[in-house]
């Protein structure tokens, strides 16, 4: 358990210590944020703020994990999903930098690349020996829905949904980083409890979850260090690199914990953000009207003259409540029983 704590501390120290030089590097390279013309007017002031700060999160978390990991396939799979989704996000950021525009990698390429990530993740999950691999436990029940080969399609939806959901929420200073820390803390606590319960019951067939906890702690520490510089007014943005990486990490945890549907609660804020966009598009297309002033929904509250910090803190509170529900369901229905 000491490894878990040290991983978080190491990642946090690296992230905070390297932050100023990394931000200066981004400024020198003129890797600044491009702002959508149709976005809120007060976001114009954010133009040019260094972005792709997610690289700092990935570096700090990876170094801490490599230094303290037991190299179990469970933790390595989460690291793979995190880095792979981060690489897709970096490609998106790179196109924005080079073409000086707010749109990056095309949706078609993102889907193709995320499908490749999902296929490899499914293979690694199989190699890790997860029980009930191709079935999904329905939260609040003891029923497992058998998906068979469709499980691989399902985890693609989990990974793509989480990565893009966090990306949608990354529109206000501190919003995505703060909610991600809350979600990752929940998953890490789940991994720790599962490890403790499994360690006390040798008969349980459960891969070592300690590495999952180490990966989670490393990501939390790195994200906390990043938030130090991303809090309002932000000195740096995580960009698609960080947003997609953190979303991928959450999806990886949900898959390797066999708690895929709990992501609906633990990542509930991102689901709300994504649903707001879907509702807005559908109602405008078929009814010719808009439900929200602007989407994703955090922009709706901006248009209602809420301050950025008020929106950020309230979204953190919502994330905390939803994560508590997710954790309660995990404790009641997913945690291995005492013997």
Question: Could you tell me what each predicted segment is?
Answer:
Residues 97-98, 128-131:
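Short, well-ordered, mixed-charge alpha-helical segments that flank or form enzyme active sites
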Residues 71-106, 110-112:
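Hydrophobic alpha-helical hairpins/lids featuring a short glycine-rich hinge
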Residues 1-27, 57-87, 121-127, 134-137, ...:
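Alpha-helical transmembrane segments
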Residues 96-106, 136-145, 307:
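Membrane interface segments of multi-pass transport proteins and intramembrane proteases
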Residues 36-49, 100-113, 303:
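Juxtamembrane helix-capping/reentrant segments at transmembrane boundaries
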Residues 25-41, 95-103, 296:
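Flexible loop linkers connecting adjacent transmembrane helices
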